[in-house]
Every structure is written in structure tokens, then in C-alpha cells.
Amino acid sequence: MKKTLILTTALVSFGFAANADVTVMSWGGAYGAAQTEGHVKPWAAATGNAAVMVDADNPAQPIKAMVEAGNVTVDVASVEYADAIRLCDEGILEPIDAASLPAGADGTAAADDFFPGAVTECGVSTDIWANVYAYDTTKFPADAAPKTAADFFDLAKVPGKRGLRKGAKAVLEFALMADGVAPADVYATLSTPEGLDRAFAKLDTIKKDVVWWEAGAQAPQLLADGEVAMTTAYNGRIFAAAIGEGKPFQIVWDGQLYENEMYVVPKGAPNKDLAMDFIKYATSTEGLRAQAAHISYGPPRKSANVEPIIYAGDGKTVMGPNLPTAPENMTNSLLTSSDFWVDHDSELNERFQAWLAQ
């Protein structure tokens, strides 16, 4: 029933795109806008094909429902790395011909130009993004502002409500890092009953003060409305609010969890060949730089990071220091393990939901 409802919603919501040559599904908000400005519009202009962007809270869910129902209306989807691996294993996605991806602008072969892990059997990275936390600078004196992952969980030192994404992924890892587990040891720790108990025990320390969010747009809105003192968020959402809208928000990079976002093609996409062409265009050196000019997610190609990228919103902000991949932002960071979440997503989310209900 759940899959049927998801599919029905998807078909109703996205039916208006039926006449488009390529339909791209993404996450909406600042991220969807960045992909629209950096990829969808330029590709359409360059090729003469029609293209449209549609939104979903998590594109992996509706595209899986569409494929299983045999009624696919989306050609390209933007999904999290673990979902790209899982859906590929389940036969939901078309394979990607990695050899067909264009060389970098400097002539470097794609296989050598992409960062390790950025190209998988069924997906190509469009950016590297991060789960971070942020606070409103007007709420804290400079000498009392939160600075570490541990501060997020320290209600005595930094009082106030906390915003957290409602799910196990990125929350359990963040809790362990805040509790002193080194990034290199997080997944080994989380793979043990004792480590899992430790993560939930850390979450227990702030549970009564948490405001849960699900859609990415909710996190910066919680800050703007004063509902929380600080919140976890997608770094691009905070950048868009702070730099694009002038909100007094500050990111704390300590304890960030970063990962690749992937473009994939659902099995049975109505315009498969055009979808593949779109992905080649979007993940070229120029395509990746074009997206990064609109949102603070790092390009996953070496050639796309050679020259400074300037924020299109104001024509002056240099994006480098605002990216998850900036060296100064990666001091205490963790690359999200897709293998871990492919293997443990269901069981850990079941326990997470049970914990929420307690």
C-alpha cells in the first residue's frame, strides 16, 4: 500500500512533465535550483531538447515505486550515494557506461579526473555535500558560540532546543563523534551492540529538547523562526540562507558527514539516451562548476576545482572556503559509508523509530 501511495503521488505531482524530453527529479529548494540553473537550463539550451525539473522529498522512493509499477515518468534522478548503490543492486537503475563520460577540461580521462568512488555502476556524482550543524549568530556572544560536535549535545554549556533530521543516518554517526569517537572508528563502533547503545545514549541526553525535521527546507526555517538554538542541516541550505538571503547563520564544520550525491537513470526511463547525454553534460568539468556556482557543494572532479568558483548569487563570494571539501573544514569529518547503510539501513531505522516512540 505504501508503495502504491508513493507512486500515485508521484504520477499526480509530476504528470505535467510528460511532454518534456527529459524530466529530472531532485530535492527542491536551493539544491534543485542549483541543478536547474547549472544543468537543466544550460543542457536544454545547448542541445535544443526540452527539460524540466520536478521535486521530491527523497527521489529514491518515487523512482523505485515507478519502476516496480512499470510506469516510469522520470528520466534522471538525484539520489544519495547509498541509495544509488542499493537501487542498482535491486535492479531499479540503468547501468552507466563510465567509459563514455567526457574527459576533464584539461584532457584528463574521466576515470582519473573523478574523485575515488564518484562513479559507480549505476551513478555519477554531481557534487559532494555535507550534513553539518548551524546556529544563529545573533543568539550567542562570540565567546559562547558553539564550536564543536560535542557542543551540540551540551545543553548546560549551550542551552536551547536542537533541530535534528528524523532518521538514523548521519544522526547516529554525529552522536558518536560528539561522544569522542574518532571518525576512523565510527562505523566499526556503530557495528557493535555496545557502540549502537552508546550512540542512542548520547541522543538520550538531548532527546527532550529536539525538534525533528524531515525536508531539507525545514532546518534553516527552524533557525529563522527561532524554534531552535541550533540545527543539523545540509550545508548548501545554510549557505543559501546565509549568503543568498543574508540570514545570520554560521556553520560548524566540526563533525561534518560528507558524501557524494548521484545522478542515476531509472530502469525503463522514457528517454534513456537523452538521460545519459544529460548526465554526461552535467558531470563534465564545466557542468560541475556551473552547479557549484549556485550552491556550496564541492565538484567531484579534480579539473573542476583548479580555478576559483564564484557564487552566481552575488558575483563575488569565493565558494572554496564554503565547501565541505575545503581542507580547513575537514579536520574532524567523516565520509558517510554507503556500504554500512546499504547493509544496515532498515534495522537501524527500525530501532531509531522504536527509540523515538519511547
For each predicted feature, which ranges?
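Extracytoplasmic ligand-binding site segments that recognize negatively charged/polar headgroups
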Residues: 29-34, 79-84, 88-218
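Early extracytoplasmic/lumenal segment of secretory-pathway proteins
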Residues: 21-86
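Periplasmic-binding protein-like
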Residues: 196-205, 243-269
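Gram-negative bacterial Sec-dependent N-terminal signal peptides
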Residues: 1-19
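Conserved C-terminal helix/tail region of periplasmic/extracytoplasmic solute-binding proteins
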Residues: 327-358
